Amino acid sequence: MLNKIKLQQKRKLIIGWSVFALINLVVILLTVLLRAGLPNLVSKGVTPFSAQAFGDAFIFLITRVYLDNFLRQPALLLGVITLIGYLALGRGGVQSVVGALKTVIGFILLSIGSGVLVSTARPVFDTIKGLGGTGVVLLDPYFSLASANDFFTNSFLNNDYVSLIAFSLLVGFIVNIIFVGLKRWTNTNSIMVTGHVMLQQAAVVTTLFYIVLFRQIPLLGTGIAYGAQAGLVIISGIFLGVYWSTASTGTYLVTNKVTNNAGFSIGHQQMLGIMTVAKLGKYFGDKNDSAEHKKLPKALKIFEDNIFTQTIIILSLFVVLFIVILASYKGDKPLLINWDKFGAINGLEIWNTTFGGANFTLNIIGGALKMVASLIAIMTGVRMFITELQQAFQGISEKVVPGAVVAVDIAAVYGFSINSVTFGFLSGVIGQFLAVAIMAGISYIPGNQFSFVAIPLFITLFFNSGAFGVYANAEGGWKAALLLPGIIGFLEIIVISFALRTVSNAYQASALLDAKQSFDLKALMGNSLDNNNGSALKTAVEKVVNATGVNRITEAQSFVKSDSFNSLKAVNSTLAQAIEWISKSASPVDNGFIGMADWNLYFGLLVWIGAYNVIGGWILVILATVGLILLAQIIDNGKQTKVTKLQQLLKINPQLDLNN
């Protein structure tokens, strides 16, 4: 029977790969033969089936068919990765295609939710910044993912680089597998399979490394140079792979303590934080005096409901932000029209559409609910395609590195220590919002250009501070669970509020913004507005065209919010598109950041210092990567049976498991 099953799997594997190869062969033949046989449809004067025709055909195949229509399309790219993974596992053609289809649809759902989230939240943040205060950044991994997608989609005229995130994820996963495969040297034994977390982290690392490491490389036209794209993917992937290998391995032993030897590690946003809490817990209390022995009030249980708590936090936050806007706005245009609807200020009029003809007060509530709904859409889309991608990744890793430990979502440990989660959550809320209050006060320092106000949302608070409660309790009892999450949360907000502003400032000195400030708008305008001599439209357009430096971006932002923008679309859509591109000057952190311990504290310190100078940034990223490799040598991974070569070289004496 077993041999029969293996034979069926081999048959499915052969059939699946044959179909995949056949499809690619048909695409290549049709593209090359049609393009070489009918070259005059594109380029006049080229002889059909000549050497030049075939050369043009192959360039078209690579750049347009595979690069632009596949490798730069993240939904299709991830779908094909799932397809290949399932085929490698012998799932058969039908199941592989269904898995790929779910992946594509899930990513499209993510994109829809991201678009709604960013378009709803951004006008509020832009208006807050326009009041003269510092910016507000929401700490939430899905806001962060949406912000990164928006940056790579809209920052480069007619170029979409979201697929770079997927490439970084793929390289990182390969590096993770290689490191675990070389565990005799690396001392790492854990493979990340939490795809949604990996995607969020790949988005943050890829976008921020572009700003920190590649911001001064001149653009190729209005796009990222090919060498910079390759370098960005490689350095991001290596950093991610080393981080995933080391940090997840470091959670294995203490997770076994929490779960009574369940045999998995954690693959989430706070793995280094978990290691830190586990080491510090014993200094704050007695692990035998556990939080699980305490009785909690029933009223606190309501905060375990994800949707309820997200709604309360987001609604409260945006009500406060709108109160600040209403109390402080002093612009020329009316903010409110007849105390009923928002005026055309920074795009705030989008909030009028939530409940149709309702008053602005109801639309504020509706807008907050709309953002919660978009977050749910993002999470649903992510779960949909990650479920498929995760199975493909896990299956591949099991075949390549048998016996490796799987790193799973942090929620897997919550059932083992429910009270500790609540202790950590409440402690984190107090500590982080105390830091928010301090950063809000700092934001009122005149001329503040050195800090943002980072505000944590539910996912950050519950899955970051709640996790710390669990691991602090395991080593230091209820006192550690009640104190450590708040202390670490406080430090997180302080560090990341300064770090994100530094990154945003670095973006303002990037080659991308230089390209926007020097883009030849006059050539695009040409004579298209000659029939509008003396008109308000031509005057408004010329203000943008003739502006220089930062003033051009400011003028472009004002222009796209005016009625003249729609008029220009009808006359010269190419010029209108270019001006709209110039107006979009948000850095990849302005609309959201991942917001959990490893990224607020450790990665936050890295980019805070590294963003000041590109060379310094490269040095720090390399040192951080090497540091993670060395950190793996002193980690007790719980399954080590022999001393590694690096441990011998560094004279480290690890704890060996002689029973394996």
Curated annotation (Swiss-Prot):
Membrane topology is: Multi-pass membrane protein
Keyword set includes Ion transport: no
The UniProt entry, under InterPro entries, shows: Ascorbate-PTS_EIIC, PTS_sugar-sp_permease
Question: From which domain of life does this come?
Answer: Bacteria
List the subcellular locations: Cell membrane
Example GO CC term: the record gives: plasma membrane
Q: What is known of its domains?
A: In classical PTS systems, the PTS EIIC type-2 domain forms the translocation channel and contains the specific substrate-binding site. UlaA does not exhibit the topological features of any recognized enzyme IIC.
Tell me its family: Belongs to the UlaA family.
What protein am I looking at? Ascorbate-specific PTS system EIIC component
Source organism of the structure: Mycoplasma pneumoniae (strain ATCC 29342 / M129 / Subtype 1)
Q: What taxonomic classification does the UniProt entry list for its organism?
A: Bacteria, Bacillati, Mycoplasmatota, Mycoplasmoidales, Mycoplasmoidaceae
